[in-house]
Swiss-Prot record:
Its cofactor is NH4(+); K(+). Belongs to the type III pantothenate kinase family. Its main location: cytoplasm. A monovalent cation. Ammonium or potassium. Its EC number is 2.7.1.33. Pfam families: Pan_kinase (PF03309). Substrate binds at G107, A108, D109, R110, T184. Gene3D superfamilies: 3.30.420.40. ATP binds at D6, V7, G8, N9, T10, N11, I12, T13, T132. It comes from Agathobacter rectalis (strain ATCC 33656 / DSM 3377 / JCM 17463 / KCTC 5835 / VPI 0990). The keyword Magnesium does not apply. This is Type III pantothenate kinase.
């Protein structure tokens, strides 16, 4: 089985794949600094909790947007699993062509999202990932990555409100019953959630208009993607595991035999 690791700014999402099937998944907080031993032992423990033994993992692949933890994470896999993981980075085989002047500037997470959206749902496809940042990326019918958009994520926007406005509290991010808030909390929730819905619908329509790809599928992923996709008719698919699936698809293109 393959261990796929999606290293984001908030969490490391881990998926165990048996072929194209996700056998188990779990998360580790990214922000806490850890040693290679801590990563190795933590991964071993969490795998066991999900009925997966260390010896069941014969290879690993990492997709990361957080460079400063990569050394410890890679060494943890080498030391505890005897695996030198594949890293999703510039030059790796993905099956899609990146039609931008500087392909190396496109985040690894965006590439694997694009791979998964195109291979699983076909093109043209607009993939939206509601993570720490909200990203929109377009892939045409031939599998060409055309470009994308990066916007502040809902949590970043929320954090800016309660950190920079003295009287605004930290709140739970959820859809309120009405768009017109009746108090501070519900008015903040309305602004955050409905503001994101409005942004999403506008960008979807604008991308389709500029590209002329009005038949493009819209595929959504990310932690808060379910809230947004449930509130707009412009989204075709919500796939919470899209990024992990993309990492696994990229792994399978490398034709690498497992270490063990």
């Amino acid at each position: 089985m393959i261990l796929a690791l999606d290293v984001g700014n908030t969490n490391i999402t881990c998926g165990v794949f048996d072929g194209d099937r996700i056998k188990a998944s779990f998360r580790i907080t990214t922000k806490m600094p850890r040693t290679s031993d801590e990563y190795g032992m933590l991964l071993s423990t969490l795998l066991e909790r999900n009925q997966v033994g260390m010896d069941d993992i014969h290879d690993a692949i990492i997709c990361s947007v957080v460079p400063n933890i990569m050394h410890s994470l890679q060494n943890g896999l080498i030391k505890y699993f005897n695996i030198r993981p594949i890293i999703v980075e510039a030059g790796i085989k993905t099956g899609i062509r990146i039609a931008t002047p500087n392909p190396q500037q496109i985040g690894a997470d965006r590439i694997v999202d694009a791979v998964a959206a195109y291979e699983l749902y076909g093109g043209p496809v607009l993939v939206i990932d509601f993570g720490t940042a909200t990203t929109y990326d377009m892939v045409d019918e031939n599998g060409t990555f055309m470009g994308g958009i990066t916007a502040p994520g809902i949590r970043i926007s929320a954090k800016a409100l309660w950190e920079d406005a003295a009287k605004l509290p930290e709140i739970e991010i959820k859809k309120p019953d009405n768009i017109l808030g009746k108090d501070t909390i519900t008015s903040m929730q309305a602004g955050l959630v409905y503001g994101q819905i409005g942004q999403t619908e506008y960008i979807i329509n604008k991308v389709k208009e500029e590209t002329g790809m009005y038949d493009a599928k819209v595929v959504v992923t990310g932690g808060l993607g379910r809230i947004i996709s449930n509130e707009t008719e412009n989204v075709d698919v919500y796939d919470p595991d899209l990024t992990l699936k993309g990492i696994n698809l990229v792994y399978r293109k490398q034709n690498r035999k497992g270490v063990k």
